[in-house]
């Protein structure tokens, strides 16, 4: 009985090793990161480019020597910016033809799929969260309007039945989440950005 049990354990270990060798780099069971394949690429990436969705894809091979070291950055991006960007991984060892179709033959490669009509493009910056987000930000649409003394009264009285969100901030740039909200609620809600350079804290008023 002990020999049979040991044999079963050995088979499980070997199976796990084989799966790990040619498996996915990201565990989608514990994150919103998407593992792409020929069946879901168009649904998850191509079709969403008409919806102001920005996708950032890590093309990799499990044995490329770099991706395992860099995957934590991608996981961190997913944890902090899930909902603002679609993050995905594509195993080019398993789906070499799909990667080649997307113009990827070297690994790791990182590509941005911005909203149409902008074409997909290779990201060649540093693989660090702040640099990636700074680059992705360029492709985020923005329908937030800045209020000032000249248009404040108009804002207050225009379409009073529609909820309005104001952001009081001392920062010059509009927060990413506010920019995304302005796209999501373009019709049903007004988003306005009031910049107050003398305030020490940012205040969100709903």
Q: Where would I find each of the regions flagged by the language model?
A:
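Residue-level recognition of beta-strand->loop/alpha-helix junctions
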Residues: 60, 89-91, 196
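Classical eukaryotic N-terminal signal peptides for Sec-dependent ER targeting/secretion
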Residues: 1-10
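Long, highly charged low-complexity segments
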Residues: 10-11, 147, 175
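Short beta-alpha junction loops
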Residues: 93, 172, 196-200
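N-terminal leader/targeting and pre-domain segments
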Residues: 4, 15-56, 80-163, 169, ...
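Typically the conserved alpha-helix immediately C-terminal to a functionally engaged Cys/Sec
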Residues: 65-82, 172-188
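Aromatic-flanked redox-active Cys/Sec active sites in thiol-based oxidoreductases
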Residues: 58-64, 168-172
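Cationic, amphipathic, low-complexity alpha-helical segments enriched
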Residues: 194-195, 203-206
